[in-house]
Amino acid sequence: VGFKAGVKDYKLTYYTPEYETKDTDILAAFRVTPQPGVPPEEAGAAVAAESSTGTWTTVWTDGLTSLDRYKGRCYHIEPVAGEENQYIAYVAYPLDLFEEGSVTNMFTSIVGNVFGFKALRALRLEDLRIPVAYVKTFQGPPHGIQVERDKLNKYGRPLLGCTIKPKLGLSAKNYGRAVYECLRGGLDFTKDDENVNSQPFMRWRDRFLFCAEAIYKSQAETGEIKGHYLNATAGTCEEMMKRAIFARELGVPIVMHDYLTGGFTANTSLAHYCRDNGLLLHIHRAMHAVIDRQKNHGIHFRVLAKALRMSGGDHIHAGTVVGKLEGERDITLGFVDLLRDDFIEKDRSRGIYFTQDWVSLPGVLPVASGGIHVWHMPALTEIFGDDSVLQFGGGTLGHPWGNAPGAVANRVALEACVQARNEGRDLAREGNEIIREACKWSPELAAACE
């Protein structure tokens, strides 16, 4: 046969429109913007090749393996409606290309190399279909939605949280006091800001101690289970684990991690520890906009959210929907369902390119956080439903009477909305009225609404 060296078009090997996808394949939907003069088939095939077995030229060692068994295949290409020179390229990867239980390896393979590719002007990973066979190699969230409700003994409503502000500069003692006031007022959780790690003005161990004190004091006074997301993110994995272990020794219910800056390897280790030791894990998505903000390049957040469900986390920040554009609402709800449900049907109107079956992987609670206020409560309750965490930072701490009354205002607004919904009222239409009625018997809420 003889070995034939030389450069040949990717599409001869990697563009296979007749390919029938297997149940075990990992499927990817890429938004491809080819350079001028590059046909879309070649661009799609180039992505499939470079993210699997291909390189820029035919190599002698190709003969020592079965390319047909291991190569990625671009099996379908469609133009993006309303965009010039943009295509969705669907790529199927054989399962054997990936290490079991490693989100890190999955991303290194699929997005590690292709994004700097010359033939492409831009590239965005829009969605992934994770096959059941691969899902089963992951532990996933340490506990999941149902176990969390049982641990906290809170049912039939969204959970309430608050990020402690000012995020940097408070001493540990004052920080603990702010935590206590919010929890005492009626919140379920308070939160370390994502950039609170262990800085000179507040070392992590001091913060953990004072926050634990705040938790136990507020629990004793309210008769409710309380928590504070203690941020265990650190410069090394060993230090991160040390912080998580200390949190467990204090007996607190939940810790926190920045999963993109901390990295998937660290996150998965922490998630395993949390399941083994009964800690809930709150995940913050700091740095996500660097990756997901551009419409034509990067990775869509729904992929990062799927990856987090595999790596492990019980809560993850997922945007707020409120006050944003209408179109974003459906897209956001699409990945909120991807986080919570066992089975999600393909639905392009919500940005879901593939049907995803999570089998028995626990669900993740979406966290709505950022610029929300008591007036948003009816909309948030309606949009996110019971299985969510609503976080009001400035919306709690910005109350004219202080933190505890701010917490009271949020809790009253939430309970009023849940009750109204259970009585069959339409939160979307009557939301403002429901809040106004509640103001009559809650001076704290009335003050917050002024």
Swiss-Prot record:
What PTMs does it carry?
The disulfide bond which can form in the large chain dimeric partners within the hexadecamer appears to be associated with oxidative stress and protein turnover.
Q: Which residues carry this modification: N6-carboxylysine?
A: K191
The record's catalysed reaction(s) read: 2 (2R)-3-phosphoglycerate + 2 H(+) = D-ribulose 1,5-bisphosphate + CO2 + H2O; D-ribulose 1,5-bisphosphate + O2 = 2-phosphoglycolate + (2R)-3-phosphoglycerate + 2 H(+)
In this UniProt entry, the residues modified to N6,N6,N6-trimethyllysine are K4
Is Iron found in the keyword set? no
Q: Give an example GO biological process.
A: reductive pentose-phosphate cycle
| UniProt-listed CDD domains | RuBisCO_large_I
- Write out the similarity annotation: Belongs to the RuBisCO large chain family. Type I subfamily.
Q: Which NCBIfam families does this entry report, sorted A to Z? A: PRK04208.1
Name of the molecule in the record: Ribulose bisphosphate carboxylase large chain
What organism is the protein native to? Crassula rupestris subsp. marnieriana (Pygmyweed)
- What's the encoding gene here? rbcL
